[in-house]
Amino acid sequence: MSIKRSKLSVKALFAALLALVLVLGIAACGSSNDNGTSTSAGGGGGQIVSNPDNGKVTLTIGSKNFTEQIVLGEIYSQALQAAGYTVDKKLDLGSETVALAALKNGQISGYPEYTSTALTSFFSVQPEQVPSSPQQAYQESKADFEKQGLTAFPPTPFASANAVGTLKTTADKLGLKNVSDLTGQSQKLTLYGSPECRQRVDCLLGLQNGYGLQFKKFVPVDIGLRYTVLDKGQADLSILFTTDAQLAAPQDKYVILADDKHVFPAGNVIFVTDQSTAKKAGPDYEKTITQVQSGLTTKAMQELDARVDVDHQQPADVAKQYLKAAGYIG
């Protein structure tokens, strides 16, 4: 039976779901994260207290160029403003390479990065060598960043990974459940992914080297169009993120192929900043970041992403809704 949902009912659904996942996520803070590992991410409930001394410090918060990153950038920016800092924003910068370069040359004070991306893209760690423990992956990433005059704050509860996705109709037609099921079929299929995917070991290179797959064609595409090319039949396969809002929508339209050879390691988000800024900004800098991200479970992050990608709200508004619902701001 097909049920039509009005735009209003969809908004109401996401509002209810967001409130629920925030309550559950924050209640669980300090006990365990999404990977079942104990975490001391700190924070939880409690309103952010503004410190007048923080107003002497200006922080420029950056982000990469897709929904989840921009929402995180807004959450961090608004939280730091609430803590009394003077905050500028340079969100939607580009790929991880662009964001890290902006941090190193002083354009931004910090940005959210994934531990798996940091280890594989910046520090030459092979995907299968990325620690499965979020805390271990964080400690290794932090140690490598510190060699470059940077540092990183503790990880989010949620983790995200690249994934090969397709329409459910395509998966059913071709008998696809695992990525290895593409063996013998990939040369007839077109794969779309972000421009940097071509050079990443946890993306196209991993599919080629880890699975031995060759595709009919790889087409670089803007991250915001990864589902559009599937819907329009331009792509047979597309590189998706496991926290994408579209995968949480109640429609069973898209499927992710299981990464049975583990070339797509999951990564928790860490906030990367330079050591001099961290010292100048004082303890409220790290405290505020870890406090407001402590409620970001996988379900909470998917719902926040959905408010932007599905419900077409502005990232700044979504971030404010999250901070208010969690009690971080009044």
What are these regions (language model features)?
Residues T115-Q126, E140-S141, V229-I256:
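A ligand-binding cleft/hinge motif common to bilobed small-molecule-binding domains
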Residues S40-E74, L91-S95, E196-Q199:
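Extracytoplasmic "Venus flytrap"
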